[in-house]
């Protein structure tokens, strides 16, 4: 890859990206800029600065940024307006974080005069696709370096040996250890590898880091309310909150009640099936609540159309097409549908469950007068149903006469 002198690396401070940072310098002769994003992963990020400094990277080329509000406001909430779940289950916690990281990688490359960006995603997974599609959409001329697709460090042992040779500190719990891949942000935590690679084996409880076992959750339910305005959450139990603060508070409630665990075998974009364990405590509560407020504010046609669009929208995010015109077209339609999605949802949190038990809205389409089993005082003429049924039955009658 010619004409590259400086590269911006998506840097976590962990062993893999520390090796990559040094490898880019030693093997490729590049000047390295590191970028570490705080997306609410719950880790202290200043050690990443110290590790970068220890490798000789100057302070002006070390970027650590708090992106939590931008992440939830501009990525998570728009996705939640669509009720997006990949393959019906996965709330896309890893997928939705990649576009923002890629955006800042490209921007920092432009700010620092770098010729390329680099990431630590492997050649087997989805993240390489997500990072690179996003980067190319934002800067068609950017160059991307993906060391896992290039180098000969094909085993954990080889990686550790290379790290030790170049004076990179190796944590004791990494020595001789097979990869156990984790990802975390304010929306979720995911785990893959090791015992999870056998889809028949139940996920051991020690793998879960973000939620209590539902069996050990409180024996008494907890009731909460979430207020929505035009499809976005704005308050918890009547207290106004920013997007990131709202999700943080819901995460704690979900953790306490064991909500949001998902054991999933999914279809990766690159073609293989993989098994992952996901914890999305606050996101699961929020998604249930959003669905609840839509139930009384969305017209049937709009609601059903949204449900038809959702799988495609979720697939686009999963596959890395956040910055594509088709995702933006779908987003425009979804956002338009949210104009009247305002009100309050009450939920019951209990031993792994988040159940909607009440909803109200000034824009409600629910008419108790029409649905009551008591006297509706003429609100609905039941005899009208006869003609409705007759018209809808016409084609079925004609088919029946022909085929039966």
Swiss-Prot record:
Positions annotated to bind L-aspartate: 122, 126-127
Catalysed transformations (reactions): L-citrulline + L-aspartate + ATP = 2-(N(omega)-L-arginino)succinate + AMP + diphosphate + H(+)
Alphabetized NCBIfam families for the sequence: argG, PRK00509.1
Top class in the EC scheme: ligase
GO terms classed as biological process: argininosuccinate metabolic process; L-arginine biosynthetic process; urea cycle
GO terms, molecular function: argininosuccinate synthase activity; ATP binding
Upper classification of the organism: Bacteria, Pseudomonadati, Pseudomonadota, Alphaproteobacteria, Sphingomonadales
One term under GO cellular component: cytoplasm
Assembly and binders: Homotetramer.
PANTHER family registered for this protein in UniProt: ARGININOSUCCINATE SYNTHASE
Name of the protein: Argininosuccinate synthase
Keywords associated with the record: Amino-acid biosynthesis, Arginine biosynthesis, ATP-binding, Cytoplasm, Ligase, Nucleotide-binding
Entry EC no(s): 6.3.4.5
Localization per Swiss-Prot or TrEMBL: Cytoplasm
Source organism: Erythrobacter litoralis (strain HTCC2594)
Family matches, as HAMAP family: Arg_succ_synth_type1
Homology family: Belongs to the argininosuccinate synthase family. Type 1 subfamily.
Residues that, per the record, bind ATP: 10-18, 37, 120
């Amino acid at each position: 890859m010619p004409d590259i002198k400086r590269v911006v690396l998506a840097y976590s401070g962990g062993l893999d990206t520390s090796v990559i940072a040094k490898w880019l310098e030693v093997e490729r002769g590049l000047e390295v800029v590191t970028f570490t994003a705080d997306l609410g992963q719950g880790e202290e990020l200043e050690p990443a600065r110290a590790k970068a400094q220890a490798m000789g990277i100057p302070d002006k080329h070390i970027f650590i940024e708090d992106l939590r509000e931008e992440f939830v406001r501009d990525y998570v909430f728009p996705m939640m307006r669509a009720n997006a779940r990949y393959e019906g289950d996965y709330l896309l916690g890893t997928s939705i974080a990649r576009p923002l990281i890629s955006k800042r990688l490209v921007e920092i490359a432009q700010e620092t005069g770098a010729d390329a960006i680099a990431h630590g995603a492997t050649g087997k997974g989805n993240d390489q696709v997500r990072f690179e599609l996003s980067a190319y959409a934002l800067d068609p001329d950017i160059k991307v370096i993906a060391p896992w697709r290039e180098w000969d460090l094909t085993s954990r042992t080889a990686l550790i040996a290379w790290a030790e040779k170049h004076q990179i500190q190796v944590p004791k719990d990494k020595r001789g250890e097979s990869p156990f891949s984790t990802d975390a942000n304010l929306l979720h935590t995911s785990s893959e590898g090791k015992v999870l690679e056998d889809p028949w084996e139940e996920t051991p409880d020690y793998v879960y880091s973000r939620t209590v076992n539902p069996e050990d959750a409180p024996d008494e339910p907890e009731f909460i309310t979430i207020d929505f305005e035009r499809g976005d959450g704005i308050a918890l139990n009547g207290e106004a909150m920013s997007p990131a603060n709202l999700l943080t508070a819901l995460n704690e409630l979900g953790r306490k009640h064991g909500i949001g665990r998902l054991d999933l075998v999914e279809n990766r974009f690159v073609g293989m099936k993989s098994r992952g364990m996901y914890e999305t405590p606050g996101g699961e509560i929020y998604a249930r609540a959003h669905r609840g407020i839509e139930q009384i504010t969305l017209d049937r046609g709009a609601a059903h159309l949204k449900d038809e669009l959702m799988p495609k929208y979720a697939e686009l995010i999963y596959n890395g097409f956040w910055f594509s015109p088709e995702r933006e077209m779908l987003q425009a339609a979804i956002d338009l549908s949210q104009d009247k999605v305002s009100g309050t949802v009450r939920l019951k949190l209990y031993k792994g469950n988040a159940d909607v038990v009440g909803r109200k809205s000034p824009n409600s389409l629910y008419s108790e007068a029409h649905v009551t089993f008591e006297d509706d005082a003429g609100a609905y003429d039941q005899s009208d149903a006869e003609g409705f049924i007759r018209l809808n039955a016409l084609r079925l009658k004609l088919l029946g006469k022909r085929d039966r």
